[in-house]
């Protein structure tokens, strides 16, 4: 796409702003294949831009969510964003073709009945209305993206606050010494400071920019999480079993986000496991590309019809007892964190036999590994 066109077709210049893991998905591949078709009727020039390498494009084109496809020429500029770019494009290409025919005739011609009932001006007004509707849909997508970021950060704030409160209670009861108390409070304050920065960036950033992937020892992270939750399980005689091989490879992930996923899953398991029950944390090196992590409990289980819904935004299942509050925003946050890392998350459960939540994380491949490479390998994006 982009060379001189022997058929003399009008040039259509497009800019696709997308991260590498977006380009590996079927949605954007379908967009590219569609633009390569002869019946599109244009000489298409498609430029690709990675927002992590060219962040100025987000401000220039007022983009909050990616991927986004931008029509640069012919004017007017249009922006298509969200999960249905191909459908939007198919609706607009015929109109662009018609606009090209009309402009080729020259604007000095008197308005004519192009389709037997509507004049050129009426068609132009209709196109302007459709542009406004499309911009409104894009704005709604941006608002939803910001809402998801806010829910994630707000939900994550609970963890350091709860840990600080438990540490204060333990210190007052003489269960921990002053040195450990100060260490816990210092770490929790650092976490809250980082979260406050996330909140300040919610209105201007993308979801992916809140992640800092690095070489990570997931076994050590899980040990810290279990220790942090000990006040919740020791007093109830709940046994936490771990099955983590000593040769488990390091993963390529954001430490804060992986800790958040493990905390959410273990907290949910503790909520639904009765006194005297057990929880199992397992980590397996399934392939050369990923580590598989499972958190299984001996609770009441999850109804089959609810097992897909629990990972959706704004879904909270009814509580099963006075002690539980239902699966809520935490699982949708877990799903998004795992997917940004290039993995997936699912649950296996039978009523009365507990629930087992499993997610995958990419393995650290070496110093040259880039963010998004794991997603290209897995090829598993949002369902």
From Swiss-Prot:
- CDD domains in UniProt: HATPase (cd00075), HisKA (cd00082), KaiB_like (cd02978)
Pfam families from the xrefs? HATPase_c (PF02518), HisKA (PF00512), KaiB (PF07689)
The Histidine kinase domain, residue ranges: 152-365
- Annotated catalysed reactions: ATP + protein L-histidine = ADP + protein N-phospho-L-histidine
Q: Name one GO molecular function term.
A: phosphorelay response regulator activity
Q: Tell me which InterPro entries the record gives.
A: HATPase_C_sf (IPR036890), His_kinase_dom (IPR005467), HisK_dim/P_dom (IPR003661), HisK_dim/P_sf (IPR036097), KaiB_domain (IPR011649), Kinase_SasA (IPR023527), Light-responsive_reg (IPR052545), Sig_transdc_His_kin-like_C (IPR004358)
- Superkingdom in the source lineage: Bacteria
| GO terms (BP aspect) | circadian rhythm; osmosensory signaling via phosphorelay pathway
Q: What is its EC number?
A: 2.7.13.3
Return the HAMAP family for the record: Kinase_SasA
| Biological function | Member of the two-component regulatory system SasA/RpaA involved in genome-wide circadian gene expression. One of several clock output pathways. Participates in the Kai clock protein complex, the main circadian regulator in cyanobacteria, via its interaction with KaiC. KaiC enhances the autophosphorylation activity of SasA, which then transfers its phosphate group to RpaA to activate it. In addition to its output function, recruits fold-shifted KaiB (KaiB(fs)) to KaiC to cooperatively form the KaiB(6):KaiC(6) complex (independent of SasA kinase activity).
Put simply, this protein is called: Adaptive-response sensory kinase SasA
Source organism per entry reads Parasynechococcus marenigrum (strain WH8102)
């Amino acid at each position: 796409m982009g060379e001189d066109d022997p058929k003399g077709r009008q040039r259509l210049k497009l800019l696709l702003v997308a991260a590498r893991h977006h380009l590996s998905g079927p949605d954007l591949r379908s967009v590219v294949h569609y633009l390569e078709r002869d019946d599109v009727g244009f000489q298409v020039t498609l430029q690709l831009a990675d927002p992590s390498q060219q962040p100025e494009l987000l401000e220039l084109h007022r983009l909050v969510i990616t991927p986004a496809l931008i029509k640069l020429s012919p004017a007017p500029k249009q922006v298509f964003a969200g999960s249905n770019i191909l459908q939007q494009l198919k609706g607009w290409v015929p109109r662009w073709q018609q606009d090209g025919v009309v402009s080729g005739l020259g604007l000095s011609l008197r308005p004519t009945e192009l389709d037997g009932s509507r004049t050129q001006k009426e068609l132009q007004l209709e196109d302007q209305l459709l542009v406004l509707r499309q911009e409104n849909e894009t704005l709604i997508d941006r608002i939803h993206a910001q809402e998801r970021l806010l829910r994630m950060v707000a939900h994550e704030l609970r963890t350091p606050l709860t840990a600080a409160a438990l540490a204060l209670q333990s210190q007052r009861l003489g269960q921990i010494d002053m040195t450990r108390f100060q260490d816990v409070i210092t770490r929790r304050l650092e976490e809250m400071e980082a979260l406050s920065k996330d909140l300040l960036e919610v209105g201007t950033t993308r979801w992916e920019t809140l992640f800092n992937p690095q070489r990570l020892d997931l076994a050590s992270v899980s040990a810290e999480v279990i220790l942090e939750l000990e006040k919740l399980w020791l007093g109830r005689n709940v046994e936490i079993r771990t099955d983590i091989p000593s040769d488990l490879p390091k993963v390529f992930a954001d430490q804060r986000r992986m800790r958040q996923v493990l905390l959410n899953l273990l907290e949910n398991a503790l909520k639904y496991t009765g006194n005297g029950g057990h929880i199992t944390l397992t980590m397996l090196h399934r392939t050369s590309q990923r580590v598989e992590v499972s958190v299984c409990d001996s609770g009441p289980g999850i109804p089959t019809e609810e097992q897909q819904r629990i990972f959706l935004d704004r879904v909270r299942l009814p509580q099963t007892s006075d002690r539980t509050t239902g699966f809520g925003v935490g699982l949708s946050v877990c799903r998004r964190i795992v997917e940004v890392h290039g993995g997936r998350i699912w649950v296996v459960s039978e009523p009365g036999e507990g629930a087992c939540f499993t997610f995958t994380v990419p393995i650290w491949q070496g110093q040259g590994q880039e963010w998004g490479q794991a997603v290209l390998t897995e090829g598993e994006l949002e369902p």
